[in-house]
Structure formats: C-alpha cells, structure tokens
Amino acid sequence: MKTTFLVSLATAALSSTAAAVSVSGSAEGFAKGVTGGGSATAVYPDTIDELVSYLGDDEARVIVLSKTFDFTDSEGTTTETGCAPWGTDAACQVAINQNDWCTNYQPDAPSVSVTYDNAGTLGITVNSDKTLIGEGSAGVIKGKGLRLVSGTSNVIIQNIAITDINPKYVWGGDAITLNDVDMVWIDHVTTARIARQHIVLGTEADNRVTISNSFINGESDYSATCDGYHYWGIYLDGSSDMVTMKGNYIYHTSGRSPKVQGNTLLHAVNNYWHDNSDHAFEIGEGAYVLAEGNVFQNIPTVAEDPIEGELFASPSESANEVCSTYLGRVCELNGFGSSGTFNQADTDFLSKFEGKNIASADSYSSVASSVASSAGNTL
C-alpha cells in the first residue's frame, strides 16, 4: 500500500512537470500549424554550453529553461574605437564600428572608446524543429540573443525573457534574428535592454512568422534618442515575408516599432502601443500593412511620414467592410488615446490575404488591459 502511494505521488509529480512545460495554446495567423519539437522528451539544460548544443543540433527537441542562462563575459570583451552619432550625453547610445559603420556612415561623429561584451554581438544558432520554453517566469537568456537563419523552420519560442545585450552599444547585438526561415512562432517572450533590434527579420525571405503576446520593453538607460526610449524595436525587411503580430505590448520605444519594408505582408492585430516618445510605424517601400483592433496610447506619431508602402489602417466602420471580401470578416477599428492620426486606407494589397491563415480580431476596447497584464513571459 505504501509503495503504491509513493508510486502514485511520483506519477503525479511527473504529470505536473510535464504539464508545466508543455506549449500553451497554438499559433494564430501565418505560422498556424507550427509544431516545433513536437512530442520530443523535454530536456533541461544546466549550463550555457548545453543550451547552445541543444538549440544548435539536428534533433527535434523540447528545451525547457528553468533558470537564468547568463552569457555575460562568456566570450570576453572588446575595447576599441567607436562613435557617438547621437551625442555624448550619458543617456545616449554609442555605436560599435561594425563593418566600418562609423567610418563610412558617420564620419563626422565624435570618436569614443567602447567596451562591449563579445557574446552579445551574435545570437545562439537555433536549428529546425525546436521548442524553447520557459518554466514559469524562470527561463531567461541574458547577454545573448537567438539567431534563426539559413533555412531553419518549425520553431516555437515561448515564455522566456531575453535581456541585457550590450544595451549601451548600437551594433552590440539583437534579441531575436530571423533570416531565411519559415514557420516560426514567437510567443509570450519578453525582450529588454537590447543593443539594437528586439526582433529583426533580415533581407532574405522569412515566409510565415507569428509574433504574439510578447512584451517589447523599450525602457533603458541608453537610447539613440537619448531619452531612455529605445529606438530599435522591430525591423521587418524580408524579401517575401508574411508576419502576424497579435497581442503584443510595445512599450517605451521611440521608433521602428515596427519598421516594415522589403516585401513584407504584415497583419498587426490587437496589439498595444504605449508611451512612445516619437513614432511607432515606419512603412517603407514594399511594405503591405493591415492594422486593426490595436490601441495606440501616448504615441505622438503613429506612422512616420512619408508612408512609402501600402497601409490599411481600418479607419472607419464603412471602410472596414472591404475586409469581408479578403479576410472573411470586417476589420476592427483601432483605438487611440493622446496619439497621432492613422487613417490611410489602401485596399489593393488586401487580396494578398486571400487563402492565408488569418488571425482573429477582437474589439480594441479590451486590448489595453488584457495585453498589458498578459504579454511577455507570464505563463
């Protein structure tokens, strides 16, 4: 009897652990159907070397982070001459002279000495068929980002935080980099105190990507706008990309939130932009942006001029009826508080949504409260 009781307790404990590390929900939008590591037995890395190995091997894996993996000082530091194109005040970011960027593009900027952590400059390689998931709020990668490139596909990143990547130094590293990938779901991820981009999709095709329920925290001691508001938020620049952004909290930024160009179809739905010191969207040539059901609170300029791509900003109930033809439903109005205008209504590109997996949309009325409380590594 006692043996049976102990076995039952052990079984219950194992079941509880399994439940705690399983993926929550499923991807909406363009990355619908992504499975990551699927039913692979979960592994719990204990060291940064084990984490790098698990993420970079060729096995389907479910990788559970149950603590902070701190890469700071793991690859040494570099001291060299950089530049200060935004000024030398204590709150200003300065730039590493990566690929002679200072020399070629900022020749008149003051030269400054920079000392940065080498680990941050290039993210951890993540190969195909991986689920990377945090256990509660414990899963943190500090001082180094994630890098998915060169054909990687079928990846889920959920309920983790990526923090403290050379925050003083532009070109010091990105939190999440995608370039030439397909079927990637970034969900309930917090990014904070990042050198450059919180999320960047490079110039090669990134195909089907969903970014959901994530917290882009732009609050920092250093910024390119020298005001504590991070400029380098989200950059979508792929040559054939379909990106769903849903339920994200984009906070305390000053630009590129997101910057969209290349050949990118973006569906931005039920996101909450809050407390921006300048502008949110930059919509360049080759951008096709549908924005609906979002909330913009204290965003002085919602979209920077000029808008060179195409934008349907869901400006009115009558205008939004056109969405029924292409999305199978009307689009939701956006909500604004102490923010600039956002009313462009290009419609020719909406046909690009036909036959695609489209995220659902709720009214903006409940977005601010629900997103602010649930976005990021809160599972």
Curated annotation (Swiss-Prot):
**Could you tell me the keywords of this UniProt record?**
Carbohydrate metabolism, Cell wall biogenesis/degradation, Disulfide bond, Lyase, Polysaccharide degradation, Secreted, Signal
Write down the SUPFAM superfamilies for this protein, in alphabetical order: Pectin lyase-like
Question: MF terms per GO, please?
Answer: pectate lyase activity; pectin lyase activity
Q: Signal as a keyword? A: yes
Can you tell which superkingdom this protein's organism belongs to? Eukaryota
Active site, renumbered: 256
Q: What is its EC number?
A: 4.2.2.10
Q: What is its main location?
A: secreted
Name the GO cellular-component terms: extracellular region
GO process annotations (BP): cell wall organization; pectin catabolic process
- What pairs make up the disulfide bonds? 83-102, 92-226, 323-331
The role this protein plays is:
Pectinolytic enzymes consist of four classes of enzymes: pectin lyase, polygalacturonase, pectin methylesterase and rhamnogalacturonase. Among pectinolytic enzymes, pectin lyase is the most important in depolymerization of pectin, since it cleaves internal glycosidic bonds of highly methylated pectins.
Task: Identify the coding gene.
Answer: pelA
Q: Sorted alphabetically, which InterPro entries does this protein's record hold?
A: Pec_lyase, Pectin_lyas_fold, Pectin_lyase_fold/virulence, PEL
What subcellular compartments does it reside in?
A: Secreted
Signal peptide residues are 1-20
Which transformation does this protein catalyse, written as a reaction? Eliminative cleavage of (1->4)-alpha-D-galacturonan methyl ester to give oligosaccharides with 4-deoxy-6-O-methyl-alpha-D-galact-4-enuronosyl groups at their non-reducing ends
| Family, similarity comment | Belongs to the polysaccharide lyase 1 family.
State the Pfam families in the record.
Pectate_lyase_4 (PF00544)
User: What does the record say about pH dependence?
Assistant: Optimum pH is 7.0.
Q: What is this protein called?
A: Pectin lyase A
